[in-house]
C-alpha cells in the first residue's frame, strides 16, 4: 500500500469538496451536492453503489438548548409568583427534554422543525470468494453548526454547559423544597434570588450554537475520504488477483451525524436484517486531527451505548504492531456520540477511531469552529488510520 499516494488522494478529495461546496449542514443543497460527488467517485470502483435518501428535521437535535432556557425563565416567573409547583414542572420538563433529545438522541422535537432531505452514499466491494463477513468503513460528510462556546472563552465551555444543566437541576430541587416548606418567607426569598441569578449562566445557552456551519474538514469529511481511498485500494488489489478472499467491504459516508446520528440510524434500520445474516464489523472514524491523540471508543452516545471492546483492543494491538500509539476510551458523559452508536444498536461489532482529546474539559481547538480546515488535519493521522484499518481487514480475512 502506497501510504503517501493514498494520503495525498484523501487530502485532495477533501480540499476539492470543501472548495466546491463549502460548509454542509445536513439537508442543505451543499450537503446533498457533496454527497452526490462522493457517490459519483464511489460508483467508479464499487461493484454496487447506492444513495439512501431520508428525512432530517433541521435544527431539531440542538433544539433542546433553547427550550431549556425558556423553561428556566418560566420557572423563575413561577417562583416570583409563589407558585413553586409550576417552577418544579418547568424544570422537570426541561430535564426530560434534555435526557431524551441529547443524552439518548431520541427524535423528541423533530416534528417541530423543517423537514429536509438528507443522503447517505455507499458502495460495496465484493471479495473474490464466499462472503463470510463484511466490514463497514465509515465517516460522515455533513458538517456541524459552529459552537460559539468553542470560539468565545473556550476554557469556560464545561462551566457553561455542565453548569447550566446543574443550575436547572437546582431549580427542580429548590422548587421542591419550597413545596415542602412553603411558609418560610426568608427561605422563599433566598431561593428566588439564587435561581434568578442562575439565569446569568443558563441564559448564555441561548447563544450556544450559530446558524452557520463549519468547513468540516476534520469533522468529518476526511473520514469519508479515507473510507473511499481504502475501498479503492481493496478494489485495486482484487483487480490484481490479490484481493480479499472472504471479506466484503462497504464504503460508507453517512449524512446528518451532526443532527443526532440520523443518517446512521436510517441506514442501520434499513439493513438490520443484513447485519444478522452476515457477521458485520464497523470501522468508523471521526474527528481525525492529531496522531498523538488516537484512541478507539468502547462506548458511545454519552456512554449509554456499549461498543465492541474486543474489536477496539484488537485494533490497538494492530496499531502497536505498526508502531502507532493508540488506546481505548469510553465516550464521556455529555460529550455526544458518533455514528457507531446506531450500528451497535443493531448488533454490529463496531468502534470509532478518534484523533483528538474527547472530554468535557478538552477538545481540539478547531472542533465545531470555522477553523476546522484541512490544514488542521495531520498528514500522519490520515496515514495511521489508513494503515491500521487495512492491516486489520487483511488479518481478519485470513481467519
Task: Outline where the language-model segments fall.
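N-terminal capping segment at the start of a domain
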Residues: 1-30, 45, 208-213, 362-372, ...
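A composition-biased, non-transmembrane "mature-region" signal
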Residues: 3, 7, 32, 36, ...
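Extracytoplasmic/secreted proteins, especially bacterial periplasmic and envelope-associated proteins
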Residues: 9-12, 16, 33, 37, ...
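Active-site-adjacent substrate-binding region
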Residues: 23, 53-55, 291-399
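A non-catalytic alpha/beta surface segment that caps or lines the substrate-entry region
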Residues: 23-126, 148-180, 185-192
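Acidic/histidine-rich catalytic neighborhood of metal-dependent amide-processing enzymes
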Residues: 91-94, 98-122, 130, 143-148, ...
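Proline/glycine-enriched tight loop/beta-turn segments at coil->beta junctions
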Residues: 127-135
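Hydrophobic/aromatic beta-strand patches that form the interior of the parallel beta-sheet core
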Residues: 135-137, 252, 281-283, 349-353
Amino acid at each position: 500500500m502506497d501510504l503517501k499516494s493514498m494520503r495525498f488522494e484523501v487530502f485532495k478529495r477533501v480540499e476539492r469538496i470543501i472548495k466546491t461546496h463549502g460548509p454542509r449542514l445536513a439537508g442543505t443543497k451543499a450537503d446533498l451536492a457533496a454527497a452526490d460527488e462522493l457517490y459519483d467517485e464511489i460508483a467508479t470502483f464499487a461493484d454496487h453503489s447506492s444513495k439512501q435518501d431520508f428525512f432530517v428535521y433541521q435544527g431539531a437535535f440542538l433544539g433542546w438548548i433553547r427550550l431549556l432556557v425558556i423553561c428556566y425563565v418560566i420557572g423563575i416567573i413561577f417562583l416570583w409568583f409563589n407558585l413553586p409547583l409550576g417552577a418544579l414542572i418547568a424544570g422537570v420538563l426541561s430535564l426530560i427534554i434534555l435526557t431524551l433529545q441529547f443524552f439518548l438522541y431520541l427524535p423528541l422535537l423533530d416534528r417541530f422543525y423543517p423537514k429536509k432531505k438528507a443522503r447517505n452514499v455507499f458502495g460495496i466491494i465484493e471479495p473474490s470468494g464466499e462472503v463470510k463477513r463484511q466490514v463497514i468503513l465509515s465517516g460522515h460528510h455533513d458538517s456541524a453548526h459552529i459552537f460559539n462556546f468553542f470560539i468565545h472563552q473556550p476554557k469556560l465551555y464545561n462551566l457553561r454547559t455542565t453548569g447550566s444543566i446543574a443550575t436547572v437541576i437546582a431549580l427542580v430541587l429548590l422548587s421542591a423544597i419550597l413545596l415542602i416548606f412553603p411558609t418560610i418567607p426568608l427561605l422563599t426569598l433566598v431561593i428566588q434570588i439564587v435561581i434568578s441569578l442562575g439565569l446569568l449562566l443558563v441564559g448564555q445557552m441561548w447563544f450556544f450554537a450559530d446558524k452557520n456551519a463549519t468547513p468540516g474538514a476534520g469533522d468529518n469529511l476526511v473520514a469519508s475520504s479515507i473510507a473511499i481511498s481504502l475501498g479503492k485500494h481493496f478494489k485495486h488489489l482484487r483487480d490484481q488477483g490479490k484481493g480479499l478472499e472472504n471479506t466484503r467491504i462497504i464504503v460508507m459516508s453517512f449524512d446528518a451525524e451532526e443532527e443526532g446520528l440520523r443518517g446512521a440510524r436510517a441506514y442501520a434500520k434499513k439493513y438490520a436484517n443484513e447485519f444478522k445474516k452476515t457477521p458485520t464489523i464497523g470501522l468508523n472514524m471521526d474527528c481525525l486531527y492529531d496522531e498523538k491523540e488516537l484512541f478507539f471508543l468502547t462506548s458511545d452516545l454519552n456512554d449509554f451505548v456499549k461498543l465492541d471492546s474486543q474489536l477496539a483492543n484488537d485494533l490497538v494491538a494492530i496499531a502497536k504492531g505498526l508502531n502507532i500509539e493508540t488506546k481505548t476510551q469510553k465516550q464521556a458523559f455529555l460529550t455526544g456520540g458518533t455514528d457507531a452508536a446506531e450500528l451497535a444498536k443493531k448488533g454490529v461489532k463496531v468502534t470509532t477511531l478518534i484523533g483528538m482529546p474527547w472530554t468535557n474539559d478538552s477538545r481540539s481547538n478547531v472542533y465545531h469552529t470555522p477553523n476546522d480546515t484541512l490544514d488542521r488535519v495531520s498528514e500522519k493521522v490520515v496515514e495511521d488510520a489508513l494503515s491500521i484499518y487495512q492491516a486489520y481487514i487483511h488479518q481478519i480475512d485470513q481467519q
